[in-house]
Amino acid sequence: MSSKAKLEEIPITVDFSGGLEMLFDNQRRHSISLPAKDTEGKPVTIAFLIDYICKKLMKDPRTDLFVLDNHIRPGILVLINDADWELEGEEAYEIQPNDNILFVSTLHGG
């Protein structure tokens, strides 16, 4: 039973930097377990993670500082295991066990 439970969840680490951590209760690192499949039975992707983060992790009501039209806001750099997400397929990337996903805001007030 425990091995089946492991197959049903994917442990990952999500980090926020560049000011984004303020949206997440000032916590930079989050160790979370995602369901292995989405509601349609497909492997979970970064798009699923973004929705999950907004619904489950974000404490601040200003979701527009993180997402815009259900996509990561321009000016936020996303790294998947230290590689630019553009090299990994962006929102279509299928999350793997023990992935490290880093969101960094490159937007700064002046």
Curated annotation (Swiss-Prot):
Pathway: tRNA modification; 5-methoxycarbonylmethyl-2-thiouridine-tRNA biosynthesis. The lineage of its organism: Eukaryota, Fungi, Dikarya, Ascomycota, Pezizomycotina. The modification 1-thioglycine is found at G110. There is a cross-link at G110 (Glycyl lysine isopeptide (Gly-Lys) (interchain with K-? in acceptor proteins)). One of its GO terms (molecular function) is metal ion binding. Signal peptide: none annotated. GO terms for cellular component: cytosol. Homodimer; homodimerization may provide an autoprotection to the highly active C-terminal residue before attacking its substrates. Forms a conjugate with the target protein AHP1. Belongs to the URM1 family. GO terms for biological process: protein urmylation; tRNA thio-modification; tRNA wobble uridine modification. It is found in: Cytoplasm. C-terminal thiocarboxylation occurs in 2 steps, it is first acyl-adenylated (-COAMP) via the hesA/moeB/thiF part of UBA4, then thiocarboxylated (-COSH) via the rhodanese domain of UBA4. The keyword Iron-sulfur does not apply. Keywords: Cytoplasm, Isopeptide bond, Metal-binding, tRNA processing, Ubl conjugation pathway, Zinc. SUPFAM superfamilies: MoaD/ThiS (SSF54285). This is Ubiquitin-related modifier 1. Acts as a sulfur carrier required for 2-thiolation of mcm(5)S(2)U at tRNA wobble positions of cytosolic tRNA(Lys), tRNA(Glu) and tRNA(Gln). Serves as sulfur donor in tRNA 2-thiolation reaction by being thiocarboxylated (-COSH) at its C-terminus by the MOCS3 homolog UBA4. The sulfur is then transferred to tRNA to form 2-thiolation of mcm(5)S(2)U. Prior mcm(5) tRNA modification by the elongator complex is required for 2-thiolation. Also acts as a ubiquitin-like protein (UBL) that is covalently conjugated via an isopeptide bond to lysine residues of target proteins such as AHP1.
